[in-house]
Amino acid sequence: MSFELPVAVYHRFEAYQGNKQSALLQEVRENLSNTYPQTTMRGDGQVVIVGFNTITVEVVPAFRYDNSGRFYMPDTNDGGRWKMVDPLAEIAYIDAADLNAFGNVRPMAQMLKTWKRHCNVPLKSYQIELLVAEFMPSYVYRHQDYFYYDWFIRDFLIWLCNKAWTNQTIPGTLELVNLGDTWLSRAQTARDRAIRACEHEHEDYTILAGEEWQKIFGDRIPIHVL
């Protein structure tokens, strides 16, 4: 979730010494903590992660750069910088991919964000969205519905395991972001579990399949579906 801050706040933090972006996220976290004192929060590079009971929200403070929809957001990595983003271009890219994949991009992205949270996968939410938007429009089963989501997840994870150290092009700004490989071992583990789950389903071992899916997504996934 992004929210726009007044430009005066930007100038105030520009006068800081040291990591201005880290100071901004710290102030955002403190203000949110005053409103939600019982909620766990932490800064994570470019966002403040707010862990409510039923949902985790990534809060992104931003400053308007121009009237075409581009913004500056904080990036605390490597000493800190202001990173330009174009949310409208990113939304348009996801919309087009979702249309080409028969409405399956957004549900898939939500499922994979659940995996990210449950297994502490070090991929950003926007990276997951862009990866799903890259994968789904050319996926052979993209026209199928949720009855095929087990195959969707399995095949996406197989594909994802070949994406280490590749670059993502961010829509709008055309920035290249390298994916690295810190997430790879968790993706490989999830891939292997998804493969086993699909094999168990094929053999009608639905509870064994459910156990594997719960290892990926947590116990909000039912262990057995009639």
Model-derived features: positions:
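Aromatic/basic-lined ligand-recognition segments
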Residues: Y65-D98
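Second-shell loop/turn segments in exported
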Residues: D98-L99, C119
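Acidic, low-complexity intrinsically disordered regions
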Residues: F3-L5, T56, Y139
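Metal-dependent nuclease catalytic cores that hydrolyze phosphodiester bonds in DNA/RNA
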Residues: H11, L24, F135
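Conserved catalytic core of two-metal-ion nucleotidyltransferases
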Residues: A15-R70
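Long, hydrophobic/aromatic-enriched structural stretches that serve as scaffold segments
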Residues: M1-G18
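Conserved nucleotidyltransferase catalytic core and NTase-mimicking acidic/glycine-rich helix/loop elements
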Residues: N104-V225
